[in-house]
Amino acid sequence: MARSRRHSRSRSRSRNQCQRRRRRTYNRRRTMREKPRHSRRRRVRRRGCSCRRCSRRRRRRC
């Protein structure tokens, strides 16, 4: 019984570490987003649709 308890405890600890790591990466991504890189994203949006049919016809509207 002691062994099973120890095992479950270690599993929970590893899960917590993973969550912490994930949170850190998310924060890093957020800071990257906040840097002035919005112009590129807007340009992509302005182009409009990106589905196969429109890209084949060199036309950006469905």
Swiss-Prot record:
Recorded GO MF terms: DNA binding
Spans through the membrane: none
GO biological process: cell differentiation; chromosome condensation; spermatogenesis
Keywords recorded for this protein, A-Z: Chromosome, Developmental protein, Differentiation, DNA condensation, DNA-binding, Nucleosome core, Nucleus, Spermatogenesis
Tissue: Testis.
Compartment(s): Nucleus; Chromosome
CC annotations in GO: nucleosome; nucleus
Residue ranges, annotated region (Disordered): 1-62
Main subcellular localisation: nucleus
Function: Protamines substitute for histones in the chromatin of sperm during the haploid phase of spermatogenesis. They compact sperm DNA into a highly condensed, stable and inactive complex.
Family, as annotated: Belongs to the protamine P1 family.
Name the UniProt record assigns to this protein: Sperm protamine P1
Classification of source organism: Eukaryota, Metazoa, Chordata, Craniata, Vertebrata
